[in-house]
């Protein structure tokens, strides 16, 4: 069993998620604060004494952070390969801190605020790749899913805390600029904690193995697992890492085009698709524009409604730690996609057909129904698509390709994040709550994609996952492999053989087996991959 201290250290890396969540959770409320609007909005109505934004300006203020995050994702890969994940986490945290300082000290120029958000996004985007990758590579297999899930848990905690801060500051009148400067200033604290905390954490053991620092690699593995170096489990894990490193690096450094080669293209596109659909579920429709959306339902306190939604998001994410470890990855993603599609369909139908009365006033009962189904959507999203997307990307790639594949997958996430955050004002102003039908369709498509393409990886080591994807086992049959694997674990003789040979046995007897077309020697690291569903 992993030491408690190791678990705490790995969970601490999820502070990167908190930084991301704090930015996401604060911007929606900040753009609706009067002092901020008086400085950066481009419309003023003297009759009502209110400020408002054009769709373009609001989209840029909210969404441009995601252009920075997309670039940060792509930059994270070469720097992570060269300097290691620990040093890069610290470096990108400094980039984040710098961006927050510029936001905090900006003059009344919306362009300067936008540029500061882009700079902040560079740090957030890079950390969204490196931090879950560090956790995946450093965690013992039996708790890896739970550890990486804490990254999403901390995102939701950051969103919730930011909403609480917004709720407490949006009515400041003595020093009105404190309405939005306090939420932004507090975000500095999370970056500072992250930077100094990383001083006490070790480097990823798999990165050390790649660099030939084998003694340090074994030392960290044994410390993380709480077992001596001569323990059979440690020897098997260490030998598996060494074999994987030697095989994956035999072809030399990985170039960007190679992540779309036959050997890895299937997983590259899967990761990009999963991360894209995590955004296309529509979660950030609520997190970025929740305050504005709920104001449209006629509520007197849209800040409170957004806070309730964020609280549901945070509370339900605790369930994800259990869901992903007990039910795996495929099942929750499929069920979650269908559930979320239903929620958005009802949300859009009520908003489009029942929210506004013939006399133009809001139907508060319809508004309450919309909030309920918004919460039911978040109930599902927080336990399925929110954490599982990061888990899949963090554990699906072999060492040689891992940093670049994770970078392009996460860049896909941030690209669609930008598309939604920027175009939502335009679309909402055009079709109103019918926008929800788009997300309902996307959620249903996401469930189908997972059923057809994603393999079940619960409880496998990173090396076993690599071999599973190299096999011809159909994605919808990998659940059967998991059940067989649990049965095999009951046999003492099979325990002595080690987890890798268990996978080999299943592959040898699987339909359309990979083993039938490859020799035993080449089975571990084949040069050509037959994609199970034709990608």
Curated annotation (Swiss-Prot):
Keywords: Glycoprotein, Meiosis, Membrane, Sugar transport, Transmembrane, Transmembrane helix, Transport
Positions in the Extracellular compartment: 31-58, 109-112, 166-181, 288-303, 352-365, 428-434
Ribonucleoprotein found in the keyword field: no
GO cellular component: cell division site; cell tip; fungal-type vacuole; plasma membrane
Glycosylation sites recorded in the entry for this protein: 359
Region annotation (Disordered) ranges: 484-535
Cytoplasmic side: 1-9, 80-87, 134-144, 203-268, 325-330, 387-406, 456-535
Membrane topology (UniProt): Multi-pass membrane protein
Protein's name in the database: High-affinity fructose transporter ght6
Native organism: Schizosaccharomyces pombe (strain 972 / ATCC 24843)
This protein's encoding gene: ght6
